[in-house]
Amino acid sequence: GYFNDGFSLQTGTGGASLAVTRFMADKMVRNKIKARFGLGGITASMVELHERGLIKTLLDVQCFDSVAAESLGKNPNHQEISANQYANPSSKGACVEKLDVVILSALEIDTQFNVNVITGSDGVFRGASGGHCDTAAAANLTIVVAPLVRGRIPTVVNQVTTCITPGSSIDVLVTDHGIAVNPARPEVQEHRLAAKLPVMSIEELNQRAYSLTGEPAAIEYTDRIVGVIRYRDGSIIDVVKQVK
């Protein structure tokens, strides 16, 4: 596994990802583990781990709250980095290339492990992707944490509304109903089974989600393209069309 002394991590800004940071601290103390660096958009929870001595260095490409901003001014090992230093795929020194574990959120994830963090289930823009696809591609272990359903809306779907991060970059999906491991990572699957965690296929999670919410009706679009989704290398991997 990667949860060893000197590991590196990034957590996303979704509620589930932030909760992981809080619970991880207790396990780090119990196991006497300290992280070499924490990366990405920095939040109060990451600052807390840093100030407790659990994360040696914070590499900050974006402060997400006032606590992080204040920390940047007073903690010498809380260091500001540029987006180029953070995740430029053409740079040999990009920080994401040194990541052991990244924990990300998702609006949708489909049965091919493709992830959507841009558009909602109604096809309308909801937010930005930040370094989602960059960290997912570069980290040694990429974990998506999300609820199986949000109200009446399934998170695990047949096909994502918009593909932001290709499924080939996602290793594990953790939901409140079970854990799915990408078949491309059989060694990760073995670790999860050995730990007696509730592992199931992503298709089973999809069926369970639909049994609770029903299968969503297809969104109707016009032919007008209102957004172009570029992957980290600049290639176009999807488009967003105007909803009727």
Which positions does each model-derived feature cover?
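Conserved phosphate- and dinucleotide-binding cores of soluble alpha/beta proteins
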Residues: 1-8, 19-28, 32-36, 44-244
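Beta-strand-loop-alpha "switch" segments that mediate conformational coupling across diverse proteins
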Residues: 14
